[in-house]
Regions:
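All-alpha prenyltransferase/terpene-synthase fold signal
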Residues: 1-347
Length: 347
């Protein structure tokens, strides 16, 4: 790939990107700020307030907005970002928050983004309805598309929605199983987490007029980046610095949650380690001793090093597909930098 040079993160006084060789490029931080301003509005009617205030509540608690911004970045690979991409980015964020509301109910989670979850604040019945109207609002946003690509976008969006539900059900099924294969777990994460990143990239490309080959490469870029992102999440929960991670480590261990680390350890460690680990996972007490023992087993089995290698494997595959996208390499630099940032993060 040709090594074009770009001055990253440089903007003019009005926060528009500076032209580099005649090409306008936005970095993630720039588009994230622009999307936040675009998205930060009332998405629902005033009444009944008991329903729509609950739906609006989570949207006002700022998240990373990774998925909608990746849609915009994918769209910009092919030309200036068009208004249809903003509608789809909004739909993606609404859909993502819909899944969070329902996931939190299923997980009985008390907090989301350090704030009470929707069902904790408003009750489970209202939270279910609030999630439902978010999904409806997502489709309303897609219906605002003017271009001839609306049918293609809807097909991708519908298929993605179905896959996310399939992934969530597999996750629920795995909770009842004593062991899960790496392949089955990878498939579940691919459906539950990665597919929305992949679809965000593909829909942005479709709206940019990309051909099927470029669409597929960007889909695979998003999919593998999502898998690498999950490996990093699992790694940080066990081995991260709590001050940088933003919360106490070991949460997945205390919750007996199946992760890449646990799956690999159960499948590859010695019989004695496996027995000890199974006994610990049946231990319901939330204490640091359990966390320390499980992490000790992880280190003995060297799954910390394995996780780093697995993350790099997914990362390399993602970047390979990005490299194969048939646009100027200069245009791909912001996505390449974003990929490295997401996977080198410590929080």
């Amino acid at each position: 790939m040709e090594q074009d040079k770009i001055q990253h993160g440089t903007t003019s006084a009005n926060n528009n990107p500076v032209k580099n060789n005649g090409i306008n490029l936005h970095m993630f931080s720039e588009l994230s700020a622009q999307f936040e301003q675009y998205f930060n509005k009332r998405h629902f009617p005033a009444l009944p307030a008991t329903l729509y205030d609950a739906a609006q509540y989570l949207l006002t608690v700022k998240g990373k907005r990774i998925r909608p911004v990746m849609c915009l970045m994918s769209n910009e690979l092919f030309d200036q970002i068009n208004k249809d991409a903003w509608h789809v980015a909004t739909a993606i964020e609404l859909f993502h928050n819909f899944t969070l509301v329902h996931d939190d109910i299923m997980d009985k989670a008390p907090l989301r983004r350090n704030m009470p979850t929707v069902h904790t604040k408003y009750g489970e019945s209202t939270a279910l309805l609030a999630g439902d109207v978010m999904l409806v609002a997502a489709y309303e946003s897609i219906n605002k598309i003017d271009s001839a690509f609306i049918h293609s976008v809807l097909a991708i969006f519908n298929e993605t929605s179905k896959k996310v539900c399939e992934g969530q059900q597999l996750d629920i099924d795995f909770e009842k199983m004593s062991s899960v294969s790496f392949e089955d777990y990878e498939n579940m994460i691919g459906l539950k987490t990665s597919v929305l990143l992949a679809a965000s990239m593909q829909m942005g490309a479709v709206l940019g007029g990309a051909g099927l080959g470029n669409q597929q490469h960007l889909y695979e870029f998003g999919k593998n980046l999502g898998l690498a992102f999950q490996v990093q999440d699992d790694y940080l929960d066990a081995f991260g610095n709590p001050e940088k991670f933003g919360k106490k480590t070991g949460g997945d261990i205390l919750a007996n949650k199946k992760t890449f680390l646990l799956i690999e350890t159960m499948n590859k460690c010695s019989a004695s380690h496996k027995k000890e680990l199974m006994e610990l996972m049946q231990h319901q007490h939330n204490d640091d001793n359990k966390i320390d023992k499980v992490i000790g087993i992880y280190k003995s089995c060297k799954v910390d090093e394995w996780a780093k290698e697995l993350k790099q494997k997914y990362m390399a595959k993602a970047l390979m597909h990005l490299d194969d996208v048939a646009v100027l390499s200069l245009r791909k630099k912001p996505l390449e930098q974003l990929a490295h940032y997401l996977l080198d993060r410590e929080s």
